[in-house]
């Protein structure tokens, strides 16, 4: 009898951030290790947009991430050019507000 392999949606080493409808998050500052291959996974019960639009840009390949209602989206690993110990501000745009948390990259 064949069995389906269950693949987890996130990895244990992912950094999880839950966004609310007002843009607030449960993890205001996220620490990401390039050498460990950490990723950020954003979750939201409602639609949300994650946007790295500050002059520092994004530490990830993409600058905008769309979180579907009731779903999640992952950043992928930090790009090689992401600066260590740098604070990357981003905006979380929820249906009823905006918040500006931070991702900090470590080697």
Where is each model-derived feature located?
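Short proline/glycine-enriched turn/loop motifs at strand-loop junctions of beta-rich domains
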Residues: 43-49
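Extracellular/periplasmic metallocenter environments
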Residues: 65-107
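Beta-strand-rich interaction surfaces with strong enrichment in secreted/lumenal proteins
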Residues: 30, 62-66
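Extracellular cell-wall/glycan-interacting regions and their flexible linkers
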Residues: 1
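Short, solvent-exposed loop/linker segments at beta-strand-coil boundaries, enriched for Pro/Gly
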Residues: 56-61
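Surface-exposed loop/turn positions
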Residues: 36-38, 46, 71
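Short, hydrophobic/aromatic beta-strand segments
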Residues: 50-54
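N-terminal edge beta-strand
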Residues: 4-39
């Amino acid at each position: 009898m064949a069995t389906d392999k269950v693949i987890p949606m996130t990895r244990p080493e992912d950094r999880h951030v839950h966004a609310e409808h007002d843009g607030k998050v449960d993890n205001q500052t996220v620490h990401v290790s390039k050498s460990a291959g950490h990723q950020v996974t954003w979750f939201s019960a409602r639609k949300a947009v994650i946007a790295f639009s500050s002059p520092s840009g994004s530490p990830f390949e993409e600058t905008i991430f769309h979180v579907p209602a009731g779903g999640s989206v992952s950043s992928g690993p930090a790009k090689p050019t992401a600066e260590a110990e740098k604070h990357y501000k981003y905006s979380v745009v929820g249906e009823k507000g905006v918040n500006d948390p931070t991702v900090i990259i470590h080697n």
